[in-house]
Amino acid sequence: YYDFSGVNNYMAYTMYQEIGGNSAMHVEPVDLYVDGEYRGIYLVTDKVEIDTNRVDVTAPDYSTAEGTPESQVRVIVDNYDTHFDTNADVKYWQGAKNGAIVTAAADDEALKAGVLAYAYAAEQAQDKLNGGYVLEVSHQYTDEAGWFITKHGVMISFKEPERPTQAQVQAAAIYVQQFEDALYSATGYNSLGKHYSDYLDIESLAKTYLLSCFTGQNDFLDCSDYLNLEPTYDENGKITGGKLMGGPAWDYDVSNYATDRLYADKSSTNVNGNQAWISQLLKHGDFTDALYKLKTGAFANAVASMKDKVATYGKNVAAS
């Protein structure tokens, strides 16, 4: 929609392939005609979904009775509004209040862990908690059946499974909250003695971050940013292991100066929001080391190889 040049997404997806990005998608530019009428230049890509050839995590099994009507429940911590900085842009957080809301029990495990709100598909059932996740960091989280908001206001929705159970949402939310607690710690360790890198594959997230920096993509960790997780569970349904993987790269419409929104503007007005994770990541030497190694290695090679590719593709776009 914002890709006025017609090359933004092509360049980003191709570079992501070049640097060995996690779950990098196939992409093919096409001229689209519908009933003989030219409709413009489109990119045909893989869909972001759980599959061995897409995002390779285990698909969950459900025992939901056929024909059960869909419904959503939203759970919100008491005094929800007081948890946010008064100078922050809260319009997206306020969306959590819309819809069916349940006053959480005092012993709700997710809220006790620091999660501020979450939603789940009430009709779904599992005999036993199982399966992996494709999560999207996105301020448009309320479009999905399952989502949660972390202690620092990061909004995360479930892309797969599309309709998660309460147990699935709680398990994933608690695990991500443990990661965030470690990320915000000066030492990088949370109260459980686990380092943030125990939860996060640093290299994979460094790839999506550096790609966003290079292309001027200001939606990083704000919208359309994917994380996937292949977890291990204990007998109580808690996630005990597995690393959040950055990727696949997606939605680079607003890159290469396609918009005048800048990181500095976003950060100054959204201090507790999604992009607050960026400043915390950059405080940790292992993340900046990963960026430097990538910048001087695989990324430098990708930039060099892309020069001819983009020029050639640009000529093709001009011809279209």
Region locations from a protein language model:
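Solvent-exposed loop/turn segments at secondary-structure junctions
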Residues: 2-5, 37-39, 47-51, 140-142, ...
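Internal "kinase-insert"/substrate-recognition segments embedded within catalytic cores
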Residues: 1, 18-25, 37-210, 314
